[in-house]
């Protein structure tokens, strides 16, 4: 197939997906190790392309990678309870610093990755105090300090920014009614934002190709039930990520995708091709086989009637 023929075929394949996703809200959670260098530049270009096609984008970034680098620089070993970082006052200051660094880098990348035919001007990046948080408190006898959990998402204010054509950028930080700031989980934050907005899609960009089954094979599709079995059966499964996916799907989000964000074009392939990329998770099985029931008989007859009449 020639290059032109391949382009035409690919564009025809993508067209229905482009039409369907126009005007839909998509929340993208990104591990912060992807938000640097060439990977950030490529990702920013793809996000700008999606915005130009009419998707309403909310980007939630992580902070663990850069926080670990800062801790290493001061010879400090981070403390965890399970998968959650224990946030003392010194760490909280670094959390705020990291959020500012990442936000600035992402804004600059989105601003500079616009190509002239695509947009007349760079996208507006909207940030704000959209998240109300509360402390996690004491878990299994461990005081989590300034590590928090989401109390409320100001969905109305986020929608106002999206209605105005902005790309919304959210850091994993939340503030309490008493004026304290808390360090949040990126997975939980992205999940809660997607639920509050009733997003069409929640996409997690990670360092992995997707979710692997217990035997090591890549799962292209999973249902909520299969994810819950995987969490139970596979101790190496990314539980925080999968719990966020299940929580989102059980509360109105249509689809969750988990992709390798370092792979060039993985987000576009997942959204606009039949084959997709990574792992796609839905509430119900993509294909299920069961014993026929008596109430299936009319549908079975309707299926075989054209063959019987030939």
Residues of each region from the PLM?
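Charged, low-complexity C-terminal accessory regions
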Residues: 106-107, 276-280, 306
């Amino acid at each position: 197939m020639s290059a032109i023929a391949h382009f035409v075929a690919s564009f025809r394949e993508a067209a229905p997906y482009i039409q369907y996703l126009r005007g839909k809200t998509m929340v993208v959670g990104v591990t912060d190790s992807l938000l640097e260098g060439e990977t950030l530049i490529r990702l920013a270009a793809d996000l700008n392309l999606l915005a130009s096609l009419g998707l309403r984008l909310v980007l939630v970034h992580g902070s663990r990678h850069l926080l670990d680098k800062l801790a290493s620089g001061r010879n400090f070993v981070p403390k965890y309870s399970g998968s959650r970082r224990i946030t003392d006052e010194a760490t909280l200051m670094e959390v705020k610093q990291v959020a500012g660094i990442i936000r600035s880098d992402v804004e600059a990348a989105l601003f500079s990755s616009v190509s002239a035919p695509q947009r007349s001007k760079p996208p507006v990046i909207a940030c704000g105090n959209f998240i109300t948080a509360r402390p996690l408190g004491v878990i299994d006898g461990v005081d989590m300090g300034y590590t928090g959990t989401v109390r409320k998402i100001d969905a109305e204010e986020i929608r106002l920014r999206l209605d105005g054509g902005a790309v919304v950028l959210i850091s994993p930080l939340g503030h309490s009614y008493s004026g304290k700031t808390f360090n949040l989980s990126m997975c939980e934050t992205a999940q809660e934002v997607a639920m509050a907005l009733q997003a069409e899609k929640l996409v997690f960009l990670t360092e992995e190709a997707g979710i692997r089954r217990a035997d090591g094979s890549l799962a292209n599709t999973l249902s909520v039930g299969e994810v819950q079995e995987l969490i139970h059966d596979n101790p190496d499964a990314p539980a925080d990520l999968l719990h966020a996916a299940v929580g989102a799907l059980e509360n109105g989000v249509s689809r969750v995708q988990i992709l390798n964000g370092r792979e060039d074009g993985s987000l576009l392939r997942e959204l606009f091709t039949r084959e997709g990329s990574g792992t796609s998770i839905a509430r119900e099985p993509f294909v299920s086989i069961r014993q026929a029931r008596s109430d299936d008989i009319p549908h079975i007859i309707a299926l075989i009637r054209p063959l019987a009449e030939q």
